[in-house]
């Protein structure tokens, strides 16, 4: 029943797919994603979305708290490593970004995600220059 109510109160598909024609403020996106988490606390995609939105708003500490919780609950969520490393790098926290990339590369190798591995290795090489 709660899911049906949720689907009526939010454009569920548009939130999750990032429909470009759907005009929703960042605050509304975060609220919608938090509503998804309230119904499904282990929803990695929703937690990742919150972290990315917070990072885009420049709320680095809040974003990192979400990324850290995401990766504790779902250590194979490869995108979480890459986006959190980017967030750390933009904040000037290069050593932490390097550590996160190394963990992400290990995850990508473990899960067979060659594309993510290549992306993270490229960023790591750039940071190590």
Predicted regions and their residues:
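Structural marker of alpha-solenoid helical repeat scaffolds
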Residues: 39, 72-73, 107-111
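Canonical positions in the second alpha-helix
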Residues: 35-36, 69-70, 104
């Amino acid at each position: 029943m709660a899911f049906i109510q949720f689907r009526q109160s939010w454009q569920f598909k548009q939130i999750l797919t990032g429909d470009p024609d759907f005009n929703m403020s960042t605050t509304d996106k975060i609220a919608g994603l938090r509503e998804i988490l309230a119904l499904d606390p282990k929803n990695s995609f929703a937690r990742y979305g919150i972290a990315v939105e917070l990072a885009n708003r420049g709320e680095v500490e809040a974003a990192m708290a979400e990324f850290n919780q995401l990766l504790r609950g779902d250590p194979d969520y490869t995108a979480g490593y890459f986006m959190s490393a980017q967030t750390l790098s933009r904040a000037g926290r290069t050593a932490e970004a390097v550590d996160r990339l190394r963990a992400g590369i290990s995850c990508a190798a473990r899960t067979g995600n060659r594309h993510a591995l290549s992306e993270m290795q490229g960023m790591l090489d750039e940071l190590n220059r």
